[in-house]
UniProtKB/Swiss-Prot annotation:
Binding residue positions for Zn(2+): 27
Species of the source: Scyliorhinus torazame (Cloudy catshark)
Boundaries of every NTR domain copy: 27-146
Sites marked Involved in metalloproteinase-binding: 40
Glycosylation sites: 210
GO cellular component: extracellular matrix; extracellular space
InterPro entries on file: Netrin_domain (IPR001134), TIMP (IPR001820), TIMP-like_OB-fold (IPR008993), TIMP_C (IPR027465), TIMP_CS (IPR030490)
Tissue: Expressed abundantly in brain and cartilage.
Region span, Involved in metalloproteinase-binding: 27-30, 91-92
Name of the molecule in the record: Metalloproteinase inhibitor 3
Physiological role: Complexes with metalloproteinases (such as collagenases) and irreversibly inactivates them by binding to their catalytic zinc cofactor. May form part of a tissue-specific acute response to remodeling stimuli.
Cystine crosslinks: 27-94, 29-121, 39-146, 148-195, 153-158, 166-187
GO molecular function: metalloendopeptidase inhibitor activity; protease binding; zinc ion binding
């Protein structure tokens, strides 16, 4: 009986340890180019956080941020105005921490049951850290490229498997995934039907796009 109790306690501790490990390591995000973050989001807004409230405590709690929306870039079909942003309270579950009354943020998220949810795997960054190219991308360029696919390249050589793909090679540089392509380029379909990187001062038109490989 003593052996059984000891074994049961050991098993319980082991399972508890595994569960805690799973929770602490649950938040793993694949890098996203800002264009894909834009295209894969239901909502993309520029906003300032003006308040926060913990709705549910504990490891599976929810944090609600009250925001002042400055501009919406994507999501008009879902809602016209966003007042609250929801995220997991625990950082281990990909909850994001936003500063109140400090920054304007670019916030991307998904809509569930009429509410906007976001987390560290979404593209969230203080507005003043965005490059001019990224800001232009939000206004029109990223939308033009939503029918293209940005394919991360971690090791050379990389191979295109479809004509709608652009290689994302920032991970091969010292800057990592927020390198030159993420900061300055958008992947756009050309009139010939294939996608390639674009960078320019003027918005790309739909009939002729000057593509530039970074």
């Amino acid at each position: 009986m003593v052996f059984s109790t000891t074994a049961a306690l050991s098993l319980l501790l082991a399972l508890s340890s595994m569960q805690l490990s799973e929770v602490s390591e649950a938040c793993t995000c694949m890098p996203n180019h800002p264009q894909e973050a834009f295209c894969n989001s239901d909502i993309v807004i520029r906003a300032k956080v003006v308040g926060k409230k913990l709705l549910k405590d504990g490891p599976f709690g929810t944090m609600r941020y009250t925001i002042k929306q400055m501009k919406m870039y994507r999501g008009f079909s879902k809602m016209q105005q966003v007042q609250y942003i929801y995220t997991e309270a625990a950082e281990s579950l990909c909850g994001v921490r936003l500063q109140v009354n400090k920054f304007q943020y670019l916030i991307t998220g998904r809509v569930f049951d009429g509410e906007v949810y976001t987390g560290v795997c979404n593209f969230i960054v203080p507005w003043d850290r965005l490059t001019l190219s990224q800001r232009k991308g939000l206004n029109h360029r990223y939308q033009y490229g939503c029918n293209c696919k940005i394919k991360p390249c971690y090791y050379l050589p990389c191979f295109v498997t479809a004509k709608n793909e652009c290689f994302w090679t920032d991970m091969l540089s010292d800057q990592g995934y927020m390198g030159h392509q993420a900061k300055h380029y958008v992947c756009i379909r050309q009139k010939e039907g294939y996608c390639s990187w674009y960078r320019g001062a003027a918005p790309p038109d739909k009939t002729r796009i000057n593509a530039t490989d970074p």
